[in-house]
Amino acid sequence: MEEYQVKIDTFEGPLDLLLHLINRLEIDIYDIPVAKITEQYLLYVHTMRVLELDIASEYLVMAATLLSIKSRMLLPKQEEELFEDELLEEEDPREELIEKLIEYRKYKDAAKDLKEREEERQKSFTKPPSDLSEYAKEVKQSEQKLSVTVYDMIGAFQKVLKRKKINRPMETTITRQDIPIEARMNEIVHSLKSRGTRINFMDLFPYEQKEHLVVTFLAVLELMKNQLVLIEQEHNFSDIYITGSESIHGA
């Protein structure tokens, strides 16, 4: 029986997930609370396993690294005596990870800046003159909303599992025959069309069955990947809303 696996391009690796957690939890990157970040990281990896997503081995390596750093942080600090009045403190176990995160953040920021500049150049060459007053209003409104990532969606799905009191991994294999993800995608699209308004992400999970919860989430991810839905969130930890894209309402 063929397994149904979903691999999301937005998963850029464990450093990307760690940066996401640091930003969302408003943590100082130079003073990472290892116990807290490890707990959140493992929760995300666990949720990805529940969903049977195609997880790269690097995520598991990072999990082991975080646990190692956490255990070293719990050990009593040792100081090596050099001279009578000089002591050398042991190296911070987080130092190497912090350096990697800072470098990765610089790379991400630079890539984002280049992409924005390229988009601006394309607009200046392709967009004809027009009245920008209404456009300015739309931009101002959109800037008030956060850019929702796949990691945000996984965090929202964690809330679903908690509300449904489902914490253990799936024991069954999701297959095309058992649970038609395409059919669930069509149901969500139909709901968006019939309502003509956005839907709260939590309202997509009316049933208790684990299989239905998982297939619904995977259906949303596929709709996101195919740009058939728009995802909105007003601020950190607030509710997430699903809106049909123009291609849905225009069909």
Swiss-Prot record:
Pfam families: SMC_ScpA
Naturally occurring in which organism (per UniProt): Bacillus subtilis (strain 168)
CC terms in the record's Gene Ontology section: cytoplasm
InterPro entries: ScpA, ScpA-like_C
Family: Belongs to the ScpA family.
Protein name: Segregation and condensation protein A
Family annotation (PANTHER family): SEGREGATION AND CONDENSATION PROTEIN A
Compartment list: Cytoplasm
Summary of subunit composition and partner proteins: Component of a cohesin-like complex composed of ScpA, ScpB and the Smc homodimer, in which ScpA and ScpB bind to the head domain of Smc. The presence of the three proteins is required for the association of the complex with DNA.
Stated role: Participates in chromosomal partition during cell division. May act via the formation of a condensin-like complex containing Smc and ScpB that pull DNA away from mid-cell into both cell halves.
Single GO term (MF): identical protein binding
Gene name tied to this protein: scpA
Keyword annotations: Cell cycle, Cell division, Chromosome partition, Cytoplasm
Gene Ontology terms: biological process: cell division; chromosome segregation; DNA replication
